[in-house]
Amino acid sequence: MNQPVVETAELMRRVEQLVDAAANRYRITVQVANRAKRRRYEDLNDDDGNFKPVLRAIFEMSDEMNEPEIIGD
């Protein structure tokens, strides 16, 4: 299974955005790790498993931060 190519500059921009928006750098790191771990076990049969869980967590969390209307609450 080939990993899709991730634009490094885009990934770094999103990571910096998350860290800058967080009050605590350690806490946002733990939140990303927990989301990745949770998604890894929830989506065992998911076909979108091409991205590593931590990359998906970073992209999801930065999207949620930028577009809060995509959160279904």
From Swiss-Prot:
It catalyses: RNA(n) + a ribonucleoside 5'-triphosphate = RNA(n+1) + diphosphate. One of its GO terms (molecular function) is DNA binding. It is an enzyme of class 2 (transferase). GO terms for biological process: DNA-templated transcription. Its EC number is 2.7.7.6. One of its GO terms (cellular component) is DNA-directed RNA polymerase complex. Keywords: DNA-directed RNA polymerase, Nucleotidyltransferase, Transcription, Transferase. Pfam families: RNA_pol_Rpb6 (PF01192). Belongs to the RNA polymerase subunit omega family. Promotes RNA polymerase assembly. Latches the N- and C-terminal regions of the beta' subunit thereby facilitating its interaction with the beta and alpha subunits. In cyanobacteria the RNAP catalytic core is composed of 2 alpha, 1 beta, 1 beta', 1 gamma and 1 omega subunit. When a sigma factor is associated with the core the holoenzyme is formed, which can initiate transcription. HAMAP family: RNApol_bact_RpoZ (MF_00366). This is DNA-directed RNA polymerase subunit omega. It comes from Gloeobacter violaceus (strain ATCC 29082 / PCC 7421). The lineage of its organism: Bacteria, Bacillati, Cyanobacteriota, Cyanophyceae, Gloeobacterales.
